[in-house]
């Protein structure tokens, strides 16, 4: 759980630092940042359209920003590196801020959206998308989209290749969210392919002779490995067969129980035979007594 909380705190701190730079460097054309923890301190790379305004006269502004980072976000010795954005129209964050400012100045949203996305495509972008959400016109909020070219919405390319930028336009009716996505000109997409018209077929087709030689080498290597394995198996000492002639046979518990049951049955059988023999003797004695009584009665009658 501690690791999860640490990741959440790091993400929250990153978002807060990004918002801080967006507010402080709005006039300088803030184009995003990158954080990299190092043993010497936190390394921060700032991208701006006007690096001179970020640094300030004699480095006054950059020292002020460094002090605020240490006090507000508890960063130890932050090292700030300011880089100039070569093509502002291909930086999604700068484009989003520009579009938000145009909406605040009263530009109609369709004109602002089409003009902005046309400038992006003219700069060489492979694709772009602008999404305006909020009270664009009227009292009801809605979403307006402007698309050009090719854009990725999910998967690893959407995270690694597509440049994202967000801005907010504060209007009289309410706020309008601005979301910009741009695919730069030199992006390598996973589904790209190239057709070579003047390609030499011999360079692309595998030579059968070379393929056969490679296959023979592979088979020879497998045969050599098999021979080595057989040699190792032959070199191992043979285990002596176990001699069970002199060993005593140990009866299991089940065998002992079976013998005990047989003995018990035999004893019960003997007891039953004794009981039946006693009954036979008693019956014989009783029969003899009856015969004697009958003889006595016959004698008395005569």
UniProtKB/Swiss-Prot annotation:
Alphabetized InterPro entries for the sequence: KH_dom, KH_dom-like_a/b, KH_dom_type_2, KH_sf_prok-type, Ribosomal_S3_C_sf, Ribosomal_uS3_arc, Ribosomal_uS3_C, Ribosomal_uS3_CS
Region (Disordered): 222-302
Keywords per UniProt: Ribonucleoprotein, Ribosomal protein, RNA-binding, rRNA-binding
Molecular-function GO terms, alphabetical: rRNA binding; structural constituent of ribosome
One Gene Ontology term from the biological process aspect of the record: translation
SMART domains noted in UniProt: KH
One GO cellular component, as annotated: cytosolic small ribosomal subunit
CDD domains named in the record: KH-II_30S_S3_arch
Record Pfam families: KH_2, Ribosomal_S3_C
UniProt domain KH type-2: residue ranges: 17-86
Similarity section: Belongs to the universal ribosomal protein uS3 family.
Function: Binds the lower part of the 30S subunit head.
HAMAP family: Ribosomal_uS3_A
Subunit note: Part of the 30S ribosomal subunit.
Name the record gives this protein: Small ribosomal subunit protein uS3
Lineage: Archaea, Methanobacteriati, Methanobacteriota, Stenosarchaea group, Halobacteria
């Amino acid at each position: 759980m501690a690791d999860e909380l640490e990741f959440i705190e790091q993400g929250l701190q990153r978002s807060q630092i990004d918002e801080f730079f967006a507010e402080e460097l709005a006039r300088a054309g803030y184009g995003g940042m990158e954080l990299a923890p190092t043993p010497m301190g936190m390394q921060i790379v700032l991208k701006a359209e006007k690096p001179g305004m970020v640094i300030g006269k004699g480095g006054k502004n950059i020292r002020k920003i460094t002090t605020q980072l240490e006090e507000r976000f508890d960063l130890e010795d932050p090292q700030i590196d300011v880089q100039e954005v070569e093509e502002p129209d291909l930086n999604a964050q700068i484009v989003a801020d520009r579009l938000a400012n145009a909406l605040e100045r009263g530009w109609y949203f369709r004109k602002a959206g089409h003009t902005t996305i046309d400038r992006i495509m003219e700069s060489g972008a492979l694709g772009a998308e602008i999404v305006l959400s909020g009270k664009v016109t009227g009292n009801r909020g809605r979403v307006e989209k402007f698309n050009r070219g090719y854009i990725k919405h999910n998967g690893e390319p959407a995270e690694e290749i597509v440049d994202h930028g967000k801005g907010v336009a504060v209007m009289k009716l309410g706020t309008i969210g601005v979301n910009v996505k741009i695919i730069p000109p030199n992006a390598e997409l996973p589904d790209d392919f190239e057709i070579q018209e003047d390609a030499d077929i011999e360079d692309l087709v595998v030579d059968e002779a070379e393929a056969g030689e490679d296959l023979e080498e592979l088979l020879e290597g497998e045969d050599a490995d098999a021979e080595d394995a057989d040699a190792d198996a032959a070199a191992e000492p043979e285990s002596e067969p176990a001699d069970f002639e002199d060993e005593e046979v140990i009866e299991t518990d089940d065998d002992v129980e079976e013998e005990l049951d047989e003995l018990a049955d035999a004893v019960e059988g003997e007891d039953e035979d004794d009981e039946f023999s006693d009954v036979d003797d008693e019956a014989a004695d009783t029969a003899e007594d009856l015969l004697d009584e009958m003889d006595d009665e016959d004698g008395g009658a005569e």
